[in-house]
Amino acid sequence: MIVLGIDPALGSLGWAVVAKDTAKLKYLASGIIKTNSKDEIHNRLAFINSTLEKVILEYQPNMAAIEETFVNTNSVTSLKLGYARGAIMSLIGRYNLDMREFKPNMVKKTVTGYGHAEKDQILHMIKLLLPGTSAITNSDEADAVAIAYTCHVMRV
């Protein structure tokens, strides 16, 4: 099974592809999709959609795992994040991928053993858990790897 993990965002979206071959997890790829905050929102969403579509076409995942979001005190920020999630979910649906959502605390607990772990702890643990991730330095990318890892570990 190949899982596409997604840390949804409008400005800096993290993605990662992790495969399971028999009992072993294998990191395949990851990256960041950055958009310019000065661009109009529909153009930013289109860029996220087209870039993530290239990832889907290249790696052919069976499932997408996406981090659930919380409602921010800033309603505009929450709304923009909702737009990004909608664009992502629409793409997932268009390619008929199974999808699972995970709460941030569940991802943190699965990867670090502690549901309130800091970003640097997640980054450290994914480097220990999945060979090939040592070059990752961006926390959004690390979160996406952690989300894909969690999806595999939870056996969903």
UniProtKB/Swiss-Prot annotation:
Transmembrane segments: none annotated. GO terms for cellular component: cytoplasm; Holliday junction resolvase complex. GO terms for molecular function: crossover junction DNA endonuclease activity; DNA binding; magnesium ion binding. InterPro entries: RNaseH-like_sf (IPR012337), RNaseH_sf (IPR036397), X-over_junc_endoDNase_Mg_BS (IPR020563), X-over_junc_endoDNase_RuvC (IPR002176). Its EC number is 3.1.21.10. It catalyses: Endonucleolytic cleavage at a junction such as a reciprocal single-stranded crossover between two homologous DNA duplexes (Holliday junction). Mg(2+) 1 binds at residues 7, 140. Keywords: Cytoplasm, DNA damage, DNA recombination, DNA repair, DNA-binding, Endonuclease, Hydrolase, Magnesium, Metal-binding, Nuclease. The active site is at 7, 67, 140. It is found in: Cytoplasm. HAMAP family: RuvC (MF_00034). NCBIfam families: ruvC. The RuvA-RuvB-RuvC complex processes Holliday junction (HJ) DNA during genetic recombination and DNA repair. Endonuclease that resolves HJ intermediates. Cleaves cruciform DNA by making single-stranded nicks across the HJ at symmetrical positions within the homologous arms, yielding a 5'-phosphate and a 3'-hydroxyl group; requires a central core of homology in the junction. The consensus cleavage sequence is 5'-(A/T)TT(C/G)-3'. Cleavage occurs on the 3'-side of the TT dinucleotide at the point of strand exchange. Homodimer which binds Holliday junction (HJ) DNA. The HJ becomes 2-fold symmetrical on binding to RuvC with unstacked arms; it has a different conformation from HJ DNA in complex with RuvA. In the full resolvosome a probable DNA-RuvA(4)-RuvB(12)-RuvC(2) complex forms which resolves the HJ. Belongs to the RuvC family. This is Crossover junction endodeoxyribonuclease RuvC. The gene is ruvC.
